[in-house]
Amino acid sequence: MPTRFRRWPALIAFAGLLIASSASAAEPDVKASAASEGIVLPKPADVQSLAVYPTKITLKGGDDAAQLILTATLADGRLQDLSGDVKYTVIDGKTVRVTPSGRVIPATNGSTEIVASYGDKSIRIPVAASQVDENLPINFANQIVPIFTKLGCNSGGCHGKASGQNGFKISLLGFEPETDYVALVKEARGRRIQTSSPEHSLLLEKAAGVVAHGGGRKMEKDSDEYKLVRRWVGAGAPYGKETDPTVTKVSIYPEHRVMSRNNRQQFSVYAHYTDGSVEDITRRAQYDSNDQEIATVDAQGVVRTLGLSGEAAIMARYQGNVITFRATVPLGQKTPAWQFPNQTVVDKFTSQKWKDLGLVPSDLSADATFVRRLFLDLTGTLPTPKQVSDFVSDKDAQKRDKLIDKLLDSPEYAFFFANKWADILRVKRGKEGNNVSRAQGTFAFHNWIRDAIANDKPYDEFVRDILGATGDETKNPPTVWYKDLAQPEQFVDDTAQVFLGLRIACANCHHHPYEKWSQDDYWGMAAFFARIGKKAVTVPSSNATQQGPTTLQVIFSKPSGNVNNKRNGQAAKMRALDGPPMDVASDEDPRMKLVDWMVDVKNPFFAKAVANRYWAHFFGRGIVDPLDDMRVTNPPSNPELLDALAKNLIDSKFSLKSLVKTIVKSRTYQLSAIPNDFNKHDKQAYARYYPKRLGAEVLLDALCQVTDSPTQFGGLPGDKYAPKRAIQLPDESYSSYFLDVFGRPQRISACECERVSEANLAQALHLLNSDEVQNKLARAGGRADALVNVKDARPDTEKVEELFLWAFARKPTSDDLKAALEHIGKYEKTKKVAYENILWALLNTKEFIFNQ
């Protein structure tokens, strides 16, 4: 029977003890009562005053409506939404009606007042309605298309997908209303619209469920949406006039509100038009929450907080415009007094957020915990037992800062972060596999990245050297970036995602559904790469190991070139995001103009993107999460903190080491991962350290360190600093089942999400029962073998302590030590097997696999 199978029965009790000890469609216009939702309303006596928004209402036409926002100021200063809880009274009883949720609907022409009252407090709202009985013109793009968007008709899963649905296709999310109008009104000989009998139009019959519809019933016949579409069809289904106003932006009220848990808040959304008019579109906009564990939102614009504290952003989208409402939800419990020293600028803004949310930070991490955390986060390497012992016993109050400075100057830091950047810069040999010429370029680019990190090359220069690279890999290794990317679209996608923290690939084909970026924005960026030229140059072999001449790719800037905007087929003008069109002379490289815009200190994306990326590396979650999806509708959990980190980077002349020091020298980074009663549910405020699984390369190297059994990687270039280390590998072409099963990325995208961090069964089985791990445990000259060598006369207690220091950077607890010694006592004649078993148990604990 193989050793690894014999090992199992004897290990169950010991491993069990050790593992256990390790750290570880439109809705009806009715609002439910507060009591039915578990909401505790304020006592009338606690309400100090009432405020209303808007302060007056003007309605035009029978289709118009307005949402009232009633806010109470309570005795303790808190604000409470009462929009659906006050009593509404219309003074003349006829001009308008007010729903229980506070929606004002015109009934007849005239002027009156609405009185909103709660207990003995009341407020009056003037209201005027006109042209209620007139059939005002309807604009297809402004009024009909938003209905299709709200009901999901033009979503990617329905008629908005590229192939359409059941023979009917309209533009995704209504971004091309002219095309939609033709498809709806004129295609198929106009069979979808029946102007002479609107209610018999196929459009309305399917939407109302009169005729079978794969998407089910979308409208009720008495709904506002049905009535408006019916009136539009009856009016001849017009598109509208060229002089009709168009939407320029949307706004929301309120923009932010501090809410208690299990509460609700109504907001209102407004469209601003080119003619200066403003329209309430609360019931026509589309909503989504970025964190439904904290807050949800319904179709009427009512936000409901749940049982968790934190912050949630509610996206409101209307005709390609987006805006967000932010809900801050404190824990709402009485907390003990606490003080938090500001070791770096980080602590100022994290501690303020904890106060806002009613959180209490965890204690400072123990020295042993910190040293392991720091070594893994900065170097991808475990500290040795001596390094742990020396650090823990050191009485210098500045020892943590000094260790940080020391590790930042280590070769392992450069290798580890070179590996991180190589992932998203797609440093690989690609389809050519072990082709020598491609391998040389890959190694050269990897070495260039490593040297740049080791020498703390200013980040703006780092990016400029990559994006503006010319020549060949022998003289300018960053030109290798242009080997894997061939089309302007690829350059735009990777540039935006890696260096600006933006995912704008959607705008290649259509307006971005969750951002303001249009196809014009996308192709304006692509135009900067239109003049890239490539040519192949054959050179003689440079060393005896090469067989024949080598072909090099030379990158240069052409005097002319363009890309066509997919939207209109015309040549796109060079234009940076949110910037005006640029003219670039024929003797200039457009890429340099793009980089000039990117690295400008006023650029709203560049510094924040890398600051957020580095923060995510150390904390496991970005201030903006996902870390490369920075957009209005995915706001930072702590915008002031992100601004401060970006400013720090700029002020340091784009020193990445300075950025790292600002983060890891903070007390926030050095907090314990052990939660308290106040932060145990925190997932976004960093009131405690969030444990992280070790990445594939780091885990393999750690396993090799603990077992003292290095992994051999065939063909690895010689290196004087860290030979035979996974974090040293220049690309993904080195065969390793271990690295693949633990989530090593193949570098086929610029997204860090390609690296898999989730656990799976294959990983567990590989650690438990693979030949690879077994061979490392049993290797002659390995850790277990050395511990039983006659030259090592130390008692078993010291040897067990050493193993724990290697694996966990701590000594064993009394229970750990007792279990280990009892296990060794059962193997007097085969003590090496006993130590192999203990190592095996250590490697299979969460404490080993996680950085905490």
Residue spans for each PLM region:
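Sequence context surrounding c-type heme c attachment/ligation sites in exported
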Residues: 126-181, 192-193, 197-200, 209-230, ...
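Long, His/Glu/Asp-enriched segments that create or flank divalent metal/ion-associated functional microenvironments
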Residues: 707-717, 725-728, 738-743, 749-766
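Primarily short, surface-exposed interaction patches in extracytoplasmic proteins
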Residues: 338-412, 423-718, 749, 753-755, ...
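Structured, non-catalytic alpha/beta "coupling" segments that mediate domain-domain communication
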Residues: 113, 117, 235-238, 306-326, ...
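Extracytoplasmic soluble-region selector
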Residues: 25-150, 159-160, 164-166, 170-171, ...
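Globin-like tetrapyrrole-binding proteins
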Residues: 838
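N-terminal secretory signal peptides that target proteins for export/translocation
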Residues: 1-7
